[in-house]
Amino acid sequence: MFYSRTLSDKARRYARRVPKGPRGKNIVGQRVAEARNLIEPAITQDALSGKLARLGIQLDRAAIAKIENNHRRVLDYELKALATALGVHVDWLFGDER
């Protein structure tokens, strides 16, 4: 029956049509991990989560791990907060060496 489809069925079909980035669901994950480890001393995902919380962004350790492993998309305001918390420019997270 056409009308018996659930919203989750429609959402799954839509998710399959949304193209993934060239390296997964985001293109900044590797740089987030790199920036986190370049800080002296390196900070943990939990510590980064705490810095983000102070900026008003709620990303727990698991969400940060998913971002770093390209298994989670990053919203624009999360990207800006990640750059601020890590002390890097947003362009750097995209791979720009500036």
Predicted regions and their residues:
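Short alpha-helical DNA-recognition segment
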Residues: 41-67
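Hydrophobic packing within well-folded, soluble alpha/beta domains
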Residues: 48, 64, 82-83, 93
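Residues that mark the N-terminal boundary/hinge immediately upstream of a DNA-recognition element
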Residues: 31, 44, 49, 60, ...
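A short, Lys/Arg-rich alpha-helix, primarily the initiator
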Residues: 2-43, 91
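Short, basic-rich loop-to-helix N-cap that marks the start of a DNA-contacting helix
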Residues: 69-84
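DNA major-groove recognition helix of helix-turn-helix
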Residues: 52, 68, 78, 94-97
